[in-house]
From Swiss-Prot:
Protein localization: Cytoplasm
NCBIfam families tied to this protein: lysS_bact, PRK00484.1
Single GO MF descriptor: ATP binding
Main localisation: cytoplasm
Name of the protein described by the UniProt record: Lysine--tRNA ligase
Pfam families from the UniProt entry: tRNA-synt_2 (PF00152), tRNA_anti-codon (PF01336)
GO cellular component: cytosol
Organism: Paraburkholderia phytofirmans (strain DSM 17436 / LMG 22146 / PsJN)
Binding positions (Mg(2+) 1): 428, 435
Record-linked SUPFAM superfamilies: Class II aaRS and biotin synthetases, Nucleic acid-binding proteins
Keyword Metal-binding set for record: yes
Cofactor: Mg(2+)
Amino acid sequence: MTEPTQPNAAQPDAARPNVAPEMDDNKIMTERREKLRELREQGVAYPNDFRPTHHAEDLQSQYEQSDKEALEANPLEVAIAGRMMLKRVMGKASFATVRDGSGQIQFFITPTDVGQETYDAFKKWDMGDIVAARGVLFRTNKGELSVRCTELRLLSKSLRPLPDKFHGLADQEMKYRQRYVDLIVTPETRKTFVARTKAISSIRKFMAEADFMEVETPMLHPIPGGAAAKPFTTHHNALDMQMFLRIAPELYLKRLVVGGFERVFEINRNFRNEGVSVRHNPEFTMIEFYAAYTDYKWLMDFTEQLIRQAAIDALGTATITYQGRELDLAKPFHRLTITQAIQKYAPQYTNEQLADSAFLRTELKKFGVDASQPQFLNAGVGSLQLALFEETAESQLWEPTYIIDYPIEVSPLARASDKVAGITERFELFITGREIANGFSELNDPEDQAARFKKQVDQKEAGDEEAMFYDADYIRALEYGMPPAGGCGIGIDRLVMMLTDSPSIRDVILFPHLRRED
């Protein structure tokens, strides 16, 4: 039997398609289509009768400490399938690196083990082909865990060549547009989305253990509400009515609190017809949760614990690195008012200046903020302070920080403070200079809520496209009585960006929105 000795570094790079480098993709595809035609003639083009018994990563982990002699003494028969990422043909012995959904493992192939006909066929296979093998687990002379193949099959022919292994998808937009290729050739991309799934699973478990019930509320709304944002519109043909893709589930979730479900949450998509940036995607994922008989202080403690646990479950630690800077989620999160944050990062501003509307408008102009925009026409000091905060302090909030005491005029659904006029029991959580969460003690006074909705309508009529509509049914629900409650929304995509050290929201959404291809 041929002794399995791995090729050394001098061997030619087999990661590239086994054709001349100068050949363009069209010629490669023509050759591969011819190979597929031959397979069709043989009646074996796309078989579906192979069932794997093992996964690569499980074998690598379980037998990491097993030496060559131990594997020979207790031979393990395995069946593995995956995509061929490397191929080295060396006369009477060949190697292939095959990657399945868990990881990768090496196949060792000889004509003695698989038969000359199969071996000759294997030599014609290409990088990217989906292959399968049965065989015995062993370790090569150089120590690599491998499968000595006794049966080898081609399950699916790859017609398009994979990108060069050393460069992958160099075009960032192409990574997003052809995510399927990115996932094939970029292990870090796959790790990102595995971490995303783990984080979401952790959140669901955390909520269940806190006695929250997961619910589903409508995606199509007759009236958009729950956030200040511009909605997508559509038309329901059967009902002949305009509908809106939801911008937030908040008002429906609070209807459920009225109905007696005291702790509810939903993880789902929201849609906002706004710009695209490294922080914004028109379609994004959030968790929103509501708990009766709690307030914004309880929410801050709960949200802090939730995020910390999500990091531990997804990454194994609460200490992470984001864009080269360490971030310790195990430490207590900071809490600052809007004015405290401004003065921390822009200490030149005095209390008197921050209480002066005229001064704030003048100062905002220096930052290029047009104070004549509809949302600023009748803005009070609180709104202007918030705008200045966004220009001076927001991007500086690297460590987890709750900004509290938001003005009523920008918080139409939040409960007013009993202690300080003009502000609400609301917070926003910032980490790495980005908003991660928004929560508050809920406004459950139907008359107060109706009055605030009317002010929002006035703002909309004045030209503010993001102002809220008047939702009469929600007011009706509140009139039946809603218990005191707290509610919070957390941006899942931004949270995952932080956990996976991803600079753009597109890096953590499998298929982000892009301009149409020309």
